[in-house]
Amino acid sequence: MGFETLAKDDSELQPTTRFRLIDIAGMLSPTSLVLFAVTVVTLSAWAQRSLTAPTAVAKNGGSAQSFREVVDETGRTVRIPQPAMRIVSLAPSMTETVYALGLQDRLVGDTDYCDYPPEAQKKQKVGGAINPSLEEIAHLRPDVVLVTRHLNTMDTVHSLDALGIPSYATDPRNVDEIVASAKRLGEVLGAPEAGAALAEDLQHRLNVLQQKIGALPPRRVLFVVWTDPLISIGKDTFIADALRRAGAVSIIDSKQDWPQVNLEEVAHLQPEVLVFADSHAEQTAPHLDVLATRPAWRILNAVRDRNFAVISEAVNRPAPRIVTAIEELAEKLHPEAFVGKPAANKVSGNTVGNKKCLCAR
């Protein structure tokens, strides 16, 4: 996966259909497979990642402000003021994590695509994630700019370096690393207690979920990223790991992050459930109706039986809210493990108006 880049410019990120191409930061894009090539190019530009936790070295340097040297998740050494009181986020996942840490008052700017929580939309905008306005960023006088290896580019990082603005990059590859990354970010921003508390809560919820569904056989699913052409997820993506945590297993056994597959191959594997990520389930339902009428798709038993699971788009972002999406999918796939939950959570038993599908809450 990538430094979150799946588009050449922000004009490619405007949604035009409910079955939109999603990047792993959770932004929605209608463009073609050229987006995936950009991811590969971006990856090659980044330094080899390091899982070394940030190491604190307090430095006064003759000034009144204290600094700390940290090693970010791509192996870069960064010098950050402590505590970091003015933060700019260049990725939706980073914005969500800042809010989850309770540090939203320090967030002075974010991108046009930082839409969660809703309050984040009121922050000063610095443009898109791919080509942010360096002038706007500099005007905000940030102590640190938060970026991700999956979305932002090395050009942006180099430009920030030239302006003397430190940037800290994350690069989580699975759910455990997302939790660890949130904790580490709290430390980097000078709020270690908040980071530890957030990570502890997320891990506790994952442990509770494992106790509920760990002994149940996993449901075989197809995670649908894009319908035409049909694109799914690779087995080493953090989304695939999220599915496993929810008691599911992707039928696509590919090392590519975003493999294009054909329906005949899927028909041979016959997934039990098709999983879609969209926070606007009621708008998604009509499109599932159309999908269910297409002869090419009706070779799948899950389509004929309308075994669709629609969950929150949070599953697409390497941020704390992914745990909520995991819990959501687990309840839909394994309702028997959740005492007191309504039968409507079953894969084949939910409705949106007269439209039968599983809806994200």
Where are these regions (language model features)?
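Bacterial N-terminal signal peptides that target proteins for export
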Residues: 17-34
